[in-house]
Amino acid sequence: MKNLKKVLSSAKILRWFILLGMAFVLPQAKAVNVIMQHNDLSRTGANTGETILTPANVATSFGRLFTNAVDGQVYAQPLYVQNLNIGGGVHNVMFVCTESNSVYAFDADAVGITYWHVKLGTPYSPTTCSDLTPVVGITGTPVIDLSRGTLYLDAKLSSGSQQLHALDITTGNEKFGGPVTVTTTGFNSSIQLQRPGLLLLSNVVYLCFGSHCDQGAYHGYILGYNATNLAPVYSWNTTPSGSEGAVWSGGMAPAVDTNGNIYVMTGNGTFDGTANFSMCMLKLSSSLTVEDYSAPTNWSSLSNGDQDFGSGGPVLIPPHYAIGIGKDTNLCLADINNMGHVGGFVQAFNAETKSGDTVGKSPVYWQGPSMQYLFLAHANNPTKSFQFTGSSVNTTPLGTATFTPSDRVGGLSLSANGATNGVLWEIGSDSNMRAYDAVHFPNVLWTGSIGTYVKMTCPTIANGKVYVGTANTIGVWGLTNFLYTQAGVSNLVLNWSAGKLLQTTNLMGPWVTNTTANSPYMVVPTNQQTFYRLSF
């Protein structure tokens, strides 16, 4: 039998004591909330406020902490709010949406604690499209407005109609008179798929739409709704006198620059550069007027070959660039101050070896310790890292992963403490999550099964934990070789790896087994002198 001091020679035993009701805990991360798809309005995919997870401890002490069951597939990225006043206390909360039209508010640190769960109607059952089955409900990642305590989402119903909901993040109750039916001129909701993450900008919630399996007379749409009363305020059709032009973006939400301009990419369809804007990277005003665009010179042949340029969304990188990739594997860099129209990219090169009817996910961008990094995932190709020089991408990869996904690629996210301790997180089509050393890519730090993966899903990293949605669960991973608790809560939730016993004692008595259950375990502080240790 070993005590915790022997288990973790680097840990001070006082960290594990609960003495006179006071917990000695590890230092906490600075405030980090993940309230939108891919972390920020630039859609970098990087959480640069992660102070707990590092390449060193992920490589040695990382694993699954717990899993909560949900009632459907989780295509939307989980969102995270820390220190939320909910359930009679202050807690960290993860928000999870499913294709069954369920929304869950789970405790982000403890297994099985559901603060609320709402079902927003019977989901849609596609009959002729197998791209997303068996049902379609909440697909696009919601967005949270912390100032109003509101979560916005789109849900598709069995009738084919779609509704915009505004939910109170502490109760799940509808707000602002919602839900409202999503509609506009020419909009046939039954054939439109709300795939990209939602955007909240200047009191407007934006929703983007593509198609189900390219079926029917669909268009690409972006619709804007007032965030305080859910009234429609803006509507834009990508191909008003043509067809198609989906805004689906592999789930990526629109990007936004510092001037409030919106950036999206569009798929196959009609293009003329005046009214119809398929196969483009677009710069739009907040009122959804076209300000500028870039398009590949071979847009027509790409469109005819179902090589959607907009299979991913744009990522904004300093000082004034947007970057994206489509099915043809060409990585395209645009100057957002002068996008150049057809052939106007400042750089375009083939970043992968295998193209075809595949999906290119948006890059992840990170300013590392000595250079700027881009990480690129594309279906049927291994993930790669590239250097961004400040004005162009070095076309020779810095590193190439050994794992090659199928034609339905997972997503990438990155955690770092500013420019240090970068870890790249990848969800693979083999239902494994991989953690890479971002600076020394493709050095693999950790690999483990997540369950049954969902295509294009992105992990969420916040305050020492990684949250991943699957076909029927939300899984939580983190450091496993110490008892870890969030500060500032009345009860302590302790996590440890399986196969150990939690034992307690006071200053006078023997060690007594407190629980044989696997972690996490909730400890209620008392006024007695109580000490905890793990035994083997």
Language model segments and positions:
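N-terminal secretory signal peptides that target proteins for export/translocation
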Residues: M1-K12
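Bacterial N-terminal signal peptides
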Residues: R15-V25
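Sec/Tat signal peptide C-region and signal peptidase I cleavage site
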Residues: L26-A31
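Mobile, glycine-rich extracellular loop/lid and propeptide segments
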Residues: V32-S286, V290-H341, G360-Q367, Y373-F386, ...
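Subtilisin-like serine protease catalytic core
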Residues: G273, G390-N394
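Detector for outer-membrane/organellar transmembrane beta-barrel domains
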Residues: N380-S385, N394-V409
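Short, composition-biased motifs enriched in small/polar/acidic residues
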Residues: T480-F536
